[in-house]
UniProtKB/Swiss-Prot annotation:
Gene3D superfamilies: 3.30.160.20, 3.30.230.10. Coiled coil: none annotated. The lineage of its organism: Bacteria, Pseudomonadati, Pseudomonadota, Gammaproteobacteria, Vibrionales. With S4 and S12 plays an important role in translational accuracy. GO terms for biological process: translation. It comes from Vibrio campbellii (strain ATCC BAA-1116). Signal peptide: none annotated. This is Small ribosomal subunit protein uS5. GO terms for cellular component: small ribosomal subunit.
Amino acid sequence: MAKEQQVQANDLQEKLIAVNRVSKTVKGGRIMSFTALTVVGDGNGRVGFGYGKAREVPAAIQKAMEKARRNMTTIALNEGTLHHPVKGRHSGSKVYMQPAAEGTGVIAGGAMRAVLEVAGVHNVLSKAYGSTNPINIVRATIDALGSMKSPEMVAAKRGLTVEAISE
């Protein structure tokens, strides 16, 4: 169910997280179609996800990749890890991520791992709570990464220097 595939396209890493067969029941029977969940990132703090649906698997994956490229957000990273611990939630899924020392690697499962890898996070400790639905985990992970603030952002917001807030 949760297949992963990585493709390089114009400096973007693309990962296929899940393909699912769905059906619509009509008067004459069932109409089968497929959904695909993908994430795209540049490995340097830009990441996006897409969800596509079509009658054939390749078409669903293509739609999902296009949506992911259009839906990219920028994340402030700190030398391949996070600036501080963050929490994110979407629907019934909750995620917790914290920075890790160099050499730790990406300690995350399934859909969360795919998002972190394409975003360019190399060292992180993470845990998913509640629902492990891949779509909700991806949304919760991107929500958590988007809520992360770099010291420069905090300093600018407070009108201070980075040195002043780090004391």
